[in-house]
């Protein structure tokens, strides 16, 4: 699971 604060 990648860490993406905003997409």
Curated annotation (Swiss-Prot):
Function comment: Induces contraction of intestinal smooth muscle in isolated guinea pig ileum.
Q: Which family does it belong to?
A: Belongs to the frog skin active peptide (FSAP) family. Peroniin subfamily.
For the biological process aspect of GO, one term held by this record is: defense response
GO cellular component labels: extracellular region
User: Where does it localize?
Assistant: Secreted
- Keyword Chloroplast (UniProt): no
What are the UniProt keywords, alphabetically? Amidation, Amphibian defense peptide, Pyrrolidone carboxylic acid, Secreted
Q: This protein is called what?
A: Peroniin-1.3
> Which tissue types show expression of this protein?
Expressed by the skin dorsal glands.
This protein's source sits in the domain of life called Eukaryota
Q: Which residues carry this modification: Pyrrolidone carboxylic acid?
A: 1
Q: Which residues carry this modification: Valine amide?
A: 7
